[in-house]
Amino acid sequence: MVQENKNFATAKAKSIRVSPRKLNLVAAFIRNMKVSEALVQLTFSPKRISKVVKACLQSAVANAENNLGLDIDRLVITNATVGKALVMKRVMPRAKGRATRINKFFSNLYITVTEKEDN
C-alpha cells in the first residue's frame, strides 16, 4: 500500500503493564479529539495509565512535526488502537495446599495523528 500524500504520523507503545480493557477506556476517550485538547484531558485524568498514553501521544506529535513537517496546531487523533500483548501467568497459594493462577495482562497502544484540512 503506497500513499502519495502522507499527512499522518504514528507512534506506538508496546508491552504496557495494564490490561487492554483498562487502556481502551482512555484510548476511546481521546479518539477523534484535537491533540491540544487531548493533552489537557490526559494531564488531569485520574487514570494511572493516562501518563503512558500522554507520552505516546507526544511522541506521535513529535514525529508529525520533525519527520513530516506538519502543523501541530491542526493535528487530530484519528486512530487510537489498543492491542493485546503477552500475558504473564503467576501462581497464588490458597488454602489447603491449592493454588490459583493469576494473569498479568500487557497491552500495545498505537496512535495515529492526522493534519486536519481547513475548509
Curated annotation (Swiss-Prot):
InterPro entries: Ribosomal_uL22, Ribosomal_uL22_bac/chlpt-type, Ribosomal_uL22_bac/org-type, Ribosomal_uL22_CS, Ribosomal_uL22_sf
Purpose: This protein binds specifically to 23S rRNA; its binding is stimulated by other ribosomal proteins, e.g. L4, L17, and L20. It is important during the early stages of 50S assembly. It makes multiple contacts with different domains of the 23S rRNA in the assembled 50S subunit and ribosome.
Coiled-coil regions listed: none
PANTHER family recorded: CHLOROPLAST 50S RIBOSOMAL PROTEIN L22-RELATED (PTHR13501), LARGE RIBOSOMAL SUBUNIT PROTEIN UL22M (PTHR13501:SF8)
Gene3D superfamilies: Ribosomal protein L22/L17 (3.90.470.10)
GO BP: translation
UniProt keywords, alphabetically: Ribonucleoprotein, Ribosomal protein, RNA-binding, rRNA-binding
RNA-binding among keywords: yes
Assembly and oligomerization: Part of the 50S ribosomal subunit.
Keyword Magnesium belongs to the record: no
Any one cellular-component term (Gene Ontology): cytosolic large ribosomal subunit
UniProt cross-references to CDD domains, sorted A to Z: Ribosomal_L22
Family the UniProt entry places it in: Belongs to the universal ribosomal protein uL22 family.
Listed name of the protein: Large ribosomal subunit protein uL22
